[in-house]
């Protein structure tokens, strides 16, 4: 008798996705981040659901309701800390996942890559509206500054900003709609993840060598299920350590002060995972130019497949491209640091140079390196 998991319409989908899925035998720990991101999403949805039961999206009570969750709700402090730090873990895994994709040429699976970039943008939008909800000083001013960027759009800018605000400033209407967005977006993300996996399973996973893996595949279970569980345990240990021992390490002290429209904090800055983009935004003296650079810093990922000039898929055997990749990584770390610094010299200049080099490495140097490596690999006879 055939096993039910191979015949039942619903079980068959699960079986073909997580149990009998043919997987390359040589994928490294860099391939763990997909499952970790899935777990992050589940953790965020569950903790978020419990927080939403006690949160009130009203300007007068939002801040107090978060304090109430932490003080009076059973394990409310833990749920809130896991949710806040879970976002940091989510972005850490996201950045590593995207970095893996760039390094090993996974972007050549165009449909999977494109839906992944859209997912990244959606997660960033969700995190942004979520950061506004506690209604602290940085929540309020972060929302004011970032939504104000839309006013740089010619002709319709100001109307668009007031439309998003639901008035003439960030107020009750803004908070209420941001809560609605923050509640619905994770479920949209969940649906997009299914599409992301659907496209991935059309082609199968890439592998570190970038070569066709069809000659050597193994079933996903038990080999990669056990490997994913190990990664999951490590992530949960880090997340719980962060949530229990230093829950406010990655937060902003200004957010312990209730929102006050009459008092601007000395340094308005977003959470750490947006700082690289914020640094690029601030590097351009023109408002519209800054907004376009901010968008380009993320949307540049969409043209990665067009910039691939090498005959090899992966960077595993391409030392020049590898050097550029790690230069790009260092560059992003510098941008993250600059994004958190005040707008004064030498930070302004460092930020501008880092922004220029970010785009130069991706658009000019990486394609050139690929072409050069192709030339170096050509056999040269006397």
Curated annotation (Swiss-Prot):
GO terms for biological process: mitochondrial electron transport, ubiquinol to cytochrome c. GO terms for molecular function: metal ion binding; ubiquinol-cytochrome-c reductase activity. Heme b b566 binds at residues 97, 196. It is a multi-pass membrane protein. The keyword Nucleus does not apply. Coiled coil: none annotated. Binds 2 heme b groups non-covalently. It is found in: Mitochondrion inner membrane. Keywords: Electron transport, Heme, Iron, Membrane, Metal-binding, Mitochondrion, Mitochondrion inner membrane, Respiratory chain, Transmembrane, Transmembrane helix, Transport, Ubiquinone. One of its GO terms (cellular component) is mitochondrial inner membrane. The keyword Methyltransferase does not apply. Its cofactor is heme b. Heme 1 (or BL or b562) is low-potential and absorbs at about 562 nm, and heme 2 (or BH or b566) is high-potential and absorbs at about 566 nm. Belongs to the cytochrome b family. Component of the ubiquinol-cytochrome c reductase complex (complex III or cytochrome b-c1 complex) that is part of the mitochondrial respiratory chain. The b-c1 complex mediates electron transfer from ubiquinol to cytochrome c. Contributes to the generation of a proton gradient across the mitochondrial membrane that is then used for ATP synthesis. The cytochrome bc1 complex contains 11 subunits: 3 respiratory subunits (MT-CYB, CYC1 and UQCRFS1), 2 core proteins (UQCRC1 and UQCRC2) and 6 low-molecular weight proteins (UQCRH/QCR6, UQCRB/QCR7, UQCRQ/QCR8, UQCR10/QCR9, UQCR11/QCR10 and a cleavage product of UQCRFS1). This cytochrome bc1 complex then forms a dimer. This is Cytochrome b. It comes from Didelphis marsupialis.
